[in-house]
Each structure stands twice: as structure tokens, then as C-alpha cells.
Amino acid sequence: MKIVGVAACTVGIAHTYIAQEKLENAGKKAGHEIHIETQGTIGIENELKQKQIDEADIVILAVDVKISGRERFEGKRIIQVSTEIAIKSPNKLIAKAAEVVGQKA
């Protein structure tokens, strides 16, 4: 399964990057291709390419604030959670994404 997403917390420092790391590790551990863009205090990092978005089976938005470029995901299956959930339960979140897509986690 191909997963893309965005992580963005209120302050844009710690939780943004922790959520990114936890999601990427959980996705890779489950055998999925995953790319998470961060939108923090220093701007957008690891910006998703349109090709990655187009090829994605699902989008995970681990966000606590309004994000830039949400319209890029129009027409895609989206799971939106807080950064706290992405940090505390990344494996469950990846399993839920696989369930939504109809694949085995």
C-alpha cells in the first residue's frame, strides 16, 4: 500500500516531527511505502510530489491545525487524526489505513 500524509502540530516543533517519524517507522515496518510531509515553524519539509499523491492509496493527516495545500488530496481517501494519536498509536493507525483501503496490515 502507498501512503502519503502531512504532520502539523499547533506549535510546529516537536509533535510535528515525532508524528512524522512514528508514522514512517510504523508504515515501513508493516511493509508499506510511506511519505509524510511536515508543516512546522520552518515551513514545509519533505514536500510531497504530485506523483506521490496521485499514486497513494490513502492519505493520513496527523494535524492539529489547518494545513497548507489540503486541496492536493481532493478525491483521495483521507484519515485525519491529531498528532497525539499518530504519536501514541502509529501501528493502529497504519492498520486502520490498510483496513480502509481493503488490504492486510
Segments from the language model and where they lie:
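Glycine-rich phosphate/diphosphate-binding loop of Rossmann-like nucleotide-binding domains
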Residues: 1, 8-27
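Ser/Thr/Gly-rich flexible loops in soluble cytosolic domains mediating phosphotransfer, phosphorylation
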Residues: 2-4, 78-105
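Fold-independent oxyanion-binding glycine-rich loops
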Residues: 8, 39-40, 62-65, 81-83
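Secondary-structure boundary/capping motif
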Residues: 14-15, 45, 89
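Short amphipathic alpha-helical segments
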Residues: 18, 71-75, 92
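Short, solvent-exposed amphipathic alpha-helical segments in soluble enzyme
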Residues: 19-24, 76-78, 96
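N-terminal beta-loop-helix "entrance" segment that forms/cooperates
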Residues: 29-56
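Mid-chain, well-packed structural core segment of small domains
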Residues: 48-52, 56-79
